Amino acid sequence: EFERAIDLPGIVGGVVPGNAFLTRPDAEAYRPLLAAANAHKAMLFIHWGPTPGDTWPRTPPGTDNFARRMGTIDMQQSLSADMVTLCMTDILDEYPDAMIHIHNLGGNIPYEIERMDHRCLLDTPDEPLPSTCMNKPGLYMDCNSFGAQAIEMGVKLYGADKILFGTDGTEFGADWSNKAVAEADIGEAARNAILHGNAARVLSHLATFAPLSEAAE
């Protein structure tokens, strides 16, 4: 299906459920899709969600604060686990031309990375610091629904060249994220890269992009 769809106008890749990358063994089943994305230099968008057969939702309906527990706490924890798989295992090494995109700044990693480094120094001092592993080639993070401070932390950890704008924003609209990027203390070059430049750079071989001013209108 991926091979068929990628040839359609405007298609840049496919969507993969986040549970597929919670651990390296989980990700093994998706090697054929990674290989297809690699062959086409296409993008796989990893979005929080179940794989077939998973118990879902993990937060039982009727739990107090269900929306907060499910739509933020569970989601961010899962995306953080995905990032550990993507960045701290070799699962992507055989697919250098595949582009991987994960939403919500890759979970809580920008906030948790200092603790991860500290625990690494204490528990596994012979292993690379997690903070040195997060700038994975071909891996990009969306910043939709996050505020200025979170975007600043994401830029500090990943680099402004790794953050995309609005790719997971259809349901929410763009006002919140536009305001957050505008208020983030990241500089104009980083701001323009997040708003337009990064997407145009990494996806222009798959789709036609309007200039930034035209796209903003």
Show which residues each predicted segment covers.
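Mid-to-C-terminal alpha-helical segments outside catalytic/metal-binding sites
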Residues: 4, 89-90, 98, 141, ...
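Active-site beta-loop-alpha junctions enriched in small/polar residues
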Residues: 17-21, 47-53, 105-107, 144-146, ...
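Histidine/acidic-residue-rich catalytic or RNA/ligand-binding cores of hydrolases
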Residues: 54-63, 106-121, 151-158, 169-183, ...
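Aromatic-anchored helix/helix-loop segment that forms the rim or "lid"
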Residues: 75-81, 124-152
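Aromatic-lined glycan-binding groove of carbohydrate-active enzymes
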Residues: 87-132
